[in-house]
C-alpha cells in the first residue's frame, strides 16, 4: 500500500510487485546464487577474460551494455558483473541480476574519505546514511540503512584470516557528487560518517526488499578530510586487483 506524502521521494509503496519487473523480458537465463558486483572500471572484463569466464548474458541500458559472466571459483559457480556508478543504475542492474537467480552478492569499490584515512585502506560499511534517492523506492523512509550481519561477518572473517587490517565505518551515500558542500561534509562528519560514496544505501535497500544477502567492501580513494584542499590522490587504483580477489574469497564463505 502506498504511503502518500507532500514530498514525492518520501512516498513509499511496500508492494514488491511492480508494473515492470526485473525479469519481465523472460530471458532464458539462470544465474548462479553467488555474485561479485563491483565498481572497478574495466577490471571485471579483464579478470573474466584471464579466468576463462563465460559471458552468459547482457544487461542493456540506454547508454551501455554490461556483460554478465559466470566462472568457477573453488568448485562453485560465481557470477561477475561490472556495476554502473550511481544509485539508480546500480540498483536497477542488481535488481535484474536478482531477478535471474542471484541471491548472495558482494560489491566492492572506492569511497572518498571524510576523516584522515590513508589511500587504498579497506573498510567495511555497517550503516549508510540515505542521502540518495533510489533506496526510498525499495525501503520505507528512514535516515539510515543498516548492513546485513551475514554479509558483514563473511567480509570480516576473510579479512581477518588473511591478516588484512580494516575498519568498520558509517558511509554517506549521496547522489550529488558536485554538491558535497563544506557545510554538508562537516555535518556528515559530526554525525559519524567516515566516508562518502554513491550506491551503498541503495543496494542495501534492494537486497532488503528482494530478500537476498548483500554486503560491500570499500577501499579508500580521494580525500575530503581537509575542506580547504581536496585531494583526488590516485583514486585507490592500487587496490583494484586485491579488492576483486577478496570479493571472490568472501562470497565463497557465504
Model-derived features with residue positions:
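Accessory terminal and edge-of-domain segments that mediate assembly/interaction
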Residues: 1-106, 112-254
